[in-house]
């Protein structure tokens, strides 16, 4: 009996091995050259997550782990209700940046050199976000995490502008995404560096962030791949559950270390 998940992993490994060891120099140059960022076929068979997408997820593990550790420390110190809003704010930034990358990749990933470079810019942005997470919990300082978030989002704007150039049918959709994302990033920067970022304003900007895809997709929906999206969400869910398990383990370990347990003979 063939298991679909196993087949996907085998295909992904095969594509990686073929690219690393069996592709000719001419094939590699063609793969890395700039190509039109045309829409992908939403019914493409056997489409799986690419090695670049898996690397992107791996980097996000770092940020999610740091956020989980900070929440864990707050729980140990009986500061749960103080730290929980910070955790939810950080997690939204991580989740929303990841989700926008994944849906765009599902619709337009052409794996050329510029696409890879812009993806690595987003990876750098996620690392900057990860570096700023402790400051959010310790002093409500969002400077670093917002800079990292804006880096990721502006790299995605560049991708949308490429899509607008090469996909005439959805050009207005792509422009709506690009303009909407830029405007919201201006809002984040102004609100934070003017020291006006409160929870109500944060929630307002979140609503605007969520509204951008709704507004953009009304003109002409992007051709995302259903099975590819399902796999991408499954991978992120596994990551989040894994971090929850690690957090539970740390809590149990600290509880056991804080008191001795005597077992009668």
Regions found by a protein language model. Name each.
Residues 14-17, 24-265:
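Multi-pass alpha-helical transmembrane bundle typical of ion/small-solute transporters
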